[in-house]
Amino acid sequence: VDMVCVELEDGIAPKDKAEARKKALALFDNPHSDDGVERIVRINSMREKFGIEDVSAILSTQTPPPALMMPKVRSPDEVIILDQLLSEAGHDTRLHVIIETNEGLEAAYEIAHSSDRMDAMFFGAIDMAPELRCDMAWEPLLYARSKVVHAAASAGLDVIDVPYLDLEDLDGMRVAAEQARMLGFSGKGSIHPKQIPILNEVFTPSADQIARARRTIAEFEKANTGLVVIDGKLIEKPVSVSYTHLTLPTT
C-alpha cells in the first residue's frame, strides 16, 4: 500500500502552523476515491502546543484524516490518550507512530501494543542519531533499528524506515533500502517522487519469489512433516512460515 503524508510538523515553520493545519484538514472535506493510497497527516508532538492544537482541530472536524502520524512518541500513554480522544469524537482514524527518541526506543514494545488503531511504526533516524549521540549511518543505528523492527513484529505492525535524504544518490538509496528490507522493514519513506520506483522494486516481492513461496508452502502442506527438501535445499517449517507474507494476490 502506498502512503501520502501531509506535513504539519518539522517541515512547517511555527508562523505557518495554523494556516498549514487549516489547509491540510480541508483536503479531507470531501471523500477520496478508493485508489489504494493511504492518506496520512503528520501532526506535531502531543507534548507541544502545536500538537495539542492539531489534535483539537481534528477532533472538531466531521471529516478527519484517515490516519495520523505521531512524531517523537516517548511513551504508550501518548498513543492511549489520542486513541481515547478519537473514540470519544467518533473518529475511526488510524495511527502511525514514529520512534525517534531515546525514551521512545526504550518503550518501543509497549508503544507497539498500546492501541488497536495502530497500523505501523516508523524509525526516525534523523532525530534518533543526536539523541543517541551517534552518526546517522547504518552501523551506529543498527541496534535502534532492530529494536523498532522487533517491537513492530511482536504486534503485527508494518515498520517503515527513515527516508534517504540524498536525492541524487539513487544507488546509495537502493543499498539502504535493501539493508532495511533484509533487517525486517516493510518499506522506506520517500521525500521525492523519483525515489518511489526503486523503493517499490526493493520492497515488492518478485514473481519468482512469490512462486517459490507458494511452492514451499504447498510442499509442506503435502508432506505434513517438519522439513522438506526443495531443489536440493533442506527447508524447515519456520522458513515456510516466513514465506506466508510473500503469498500476495497477483491481481
Stretches with model-predicted labels:
Residues 1-246:
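Expand to "…catalyze enediolate/carbanion chemistry for C-C bond making/breaking, isomerization
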Residues 247-251:
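A short, hydrophobic C-terminal helix/tail in secreted or cell-surface proteins
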